[in-house]
């Protein structure tokens, strides 16, 4: 069990922001917690699941996680859900309605923005949801604040009958800092009490609740002005002052230690009066916020036209000292500090790649062989890497589950150039259960000519191997019912004869199955069945090696894409017709090889054989 779970009150621990939030949620007496894994928020629920006296689950998607938390709150329990920024897009339907209905038990939503897009398809700013939904937004700058704000958010939620957004960023989620923890409070569950006028959100009922939602925002404005989470770090250099929030506060303090800084933790509603007070004391006021100029716009709308923000600073990425110092010093007309120059060396190229023996490679190896004749709509997951070398076998990746709808759109919008091309959708098991089922049903319903590949590797791989409804395991590893994908897609209307379940390691079968199904003008589903090589379900067997004298340099094994296979020698050979063949002679890292044998099946001259264990040769 982790040190955070065992820690006694007043203990000081080194915790990531995610672990600190989990401790704060537990100490606040929360009883229900739900999430769908998504970087950088994943570890919050993983950590929460270790605490006693709390129910925690992986939900099939963020909307369901939100609804589970809402149900807990309606029943009088303190409830929590977590997601990455794009997850709130999925959950927004339920979220935007519960903001009108309000809460019984405190309801806290942790939303982690991926500033800098280290693992996301966009950089949207979740603070917008506070404005949109008229709910308070809290922004921690470090792990200690993340812990404290998580606890406070439940009190705030219950006191003002509102969900509360805890806006995080990748930096807060993953950086570790010292946190002093406290005691768990007891919060009794009152139980669900039927109240149709409040919980049955018909137009008539919702109209009656809207005035309270609007009035609540004014009360929250006054609360933000007096909140101890908003404080001034005074400074002697009055030429410039800063208003900032989140981890940008740390960067501002490091960059300009002598300047006054108004640090906002309760960031919506914006405490305008506090900002006006600082503005009166400095020559120039700069709003430093990641990523969108939300506070800047609202302060200007309140009449503070002289402030600066995104006219000096970028809207993209983290606002680190390397960004702040040159921008602000140039604005002040000061010389930039001397920098130490070092010889510049280009880093060794390390493109993202799949793991050795990843079962997805067999699918993309086959798709790459028929690339000229297919349009391929991809999805979110490890298999997004199929867009890269050596496969180049994806045409689109937009959002979770989008492969289905986009593939249908491609099918219905064929041109003269594409009318004879097959349309393929590629989606993973967890993503299919998250948001792909509806898309497949739409393909069936609208008679689409799409071949759907469901890559079942029995895990949510990209975020770290979390369980889901298709693994047969829950958040804590306990046994649960496992979805049968064959029966599921048949229930969605796919004809039984158009459903294939194959082993992605058997390359001839993969190629023949895809070729057969793409030639048939109706919806078909191919389910690959091999566990992720990093999961508990995978069994490693004896590795392979290349016999140098038998290798012809054809490069077929390289095209499988396995990182255990590398080129050790290249040659150019002139053919009798004058064309030049580039030969690639390969070797296999036996320490990395798991014995999947995909490379063996790709090798025409049979130059790849089982490597003998060293002890067997003695």
Task: Indicate where each model-derived feature is located.
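Short helix-loop-beta junction
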Residues: 47-53, 252-262, 488-495
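Flexible, low-complexity linker and terminal segments
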Residues: 2-18, 22, 28, 140-354, ...
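Short beta-alpha connecting loops at secondary-structure transitions
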Residues: 54, 112-116, 133-138, 308-313, ...
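Short acidic, glycine/serine/threonine-rich loops at helix termini
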Residues: 44-47, 70, 91-95, 117-124, ...
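Conserved thiamine diphosphate
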Residues: 114-163, 169, 201-207, 352, ...
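Thiamine diphosphate
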Residues: 1-143, 235, 259-261, 301-527, 537-539, ...
């Amino acid at each position: 069990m982790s040190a955070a779970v065992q820690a006694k009150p007043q203990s000081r621990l080194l915790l990531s922001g995610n672990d600190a939030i989990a401790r704060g949620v537990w100490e606040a007496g929360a009883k229900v917690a739900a999430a769908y894994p998504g970087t950088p928020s994943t570890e919050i629920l993983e950590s929460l699941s270790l605490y006693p006296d709390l129910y925690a689950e992986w939900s099939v998607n963020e909307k369901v996680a939100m609804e589970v938390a809402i149900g807990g709150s309606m029943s009088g329990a303190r409830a929590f859900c977590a997601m990455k920024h794009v997850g709130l897009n999925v959950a927004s339907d339920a979220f935007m309605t519960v903001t009108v209905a309000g809460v019984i038990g405190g309801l806290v939503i942790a939303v982690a923005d991926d500033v800098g897009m280290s693992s996301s398809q966009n950089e949207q700013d979740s603070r917008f949801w506070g404005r949109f939904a008229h709910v308070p937004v809290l922004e921690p700058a470090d792990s200690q604040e993340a812990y404290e704000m998580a606890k406070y958010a439940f009190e705030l939620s219950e006191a003002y009958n509102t969900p509360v957004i805890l806006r995080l960023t990748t930096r807060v989620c993953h950086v570790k800092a010292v946190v002093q923890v406290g005691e768990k409070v007891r919060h009794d569950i009152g139980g669900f009490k039927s109240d149709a006028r409040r919980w049955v959100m018909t137009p008539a009922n919702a109209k009656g609740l809207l005035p309270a939602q609007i009035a609540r925002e004014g009360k929250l404005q006054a609360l933000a002005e007096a909140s101890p989470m908003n404080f001034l770090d005074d400074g002697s250099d009055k030429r410039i002052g800063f208003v900032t929030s989140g981890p940008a506060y740390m960067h501002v303090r490091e960059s300009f230690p002598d300047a006054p800084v108004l640090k906002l933790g309760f960031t919506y509603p914006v405490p305008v009066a506090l900002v006006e007070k600082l503005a009166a004391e400095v020559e120039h006021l700069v709003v430093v916020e990641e990523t969108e100029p939300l506070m800047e716009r609202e302060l200007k709308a309140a009449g503070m036209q002289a402030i600066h923000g995104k006219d000096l600073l970028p809207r993209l990425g983290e606002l680190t000292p390397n960004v702040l110092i040159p921008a602000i010093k140039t604005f002040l007309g000061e010389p930039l500090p001397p920098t130490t120059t070092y010889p510049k060396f280009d880093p060794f190229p390390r493109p993202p790649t799949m793991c050795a023996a990843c079962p997805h490679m067999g699918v993309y190896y086959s798709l790459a062989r028929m690339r000229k004749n297919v349009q391929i709509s991809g999805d979110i997951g490890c298999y997004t890497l199929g867009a890269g070398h050596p496969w180049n076998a994806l045409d689109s990746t937009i959002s979770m589950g989008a492969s289905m709808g986009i593939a249908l759109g491609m099918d219905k919008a064929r041109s003269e150039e594409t009318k004879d091309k097959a349309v393929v959708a590629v989606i993973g098991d967890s993503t299919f259960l998250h948001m792909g089922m509806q898309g497949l049903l739409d393909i069936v319903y609208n008679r689409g000519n799409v071949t759907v590949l469901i890559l079942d590797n029995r895990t949510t791989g990209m975020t770290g191997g979390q369980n889901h409804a298709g693994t047969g395991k829950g958040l804590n590893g306990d046994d649960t019912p496992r979805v049968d994908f064959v029966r599921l897609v048949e229930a969605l209307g796919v004809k039984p004869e158009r459903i294939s379940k194959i082993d992605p390691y058997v390359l001839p079968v993969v190629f023949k199955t895809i070729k057969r199904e793409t030639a048939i003008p109706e919806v078909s589903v191919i389910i690959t069945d091999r566990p992720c090589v990093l999961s508990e379900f995978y069994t490693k067997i004896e590795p392979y090696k290349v016999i140098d004298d038998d290798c012809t340099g054809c490069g077929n094994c390289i095209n499988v894409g396995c990182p255990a296979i590398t080129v050790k020698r290249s040659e150019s050979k002139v053919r009798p017709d004058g064309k030049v063949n580039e030969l690639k002679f390969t070797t296999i890292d036996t320490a990395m090889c798991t014995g999947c044998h995909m490379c063996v099946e790709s090798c025409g001259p049979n130059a790849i054989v089982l490597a003998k264990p060293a002890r067997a040769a003695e």
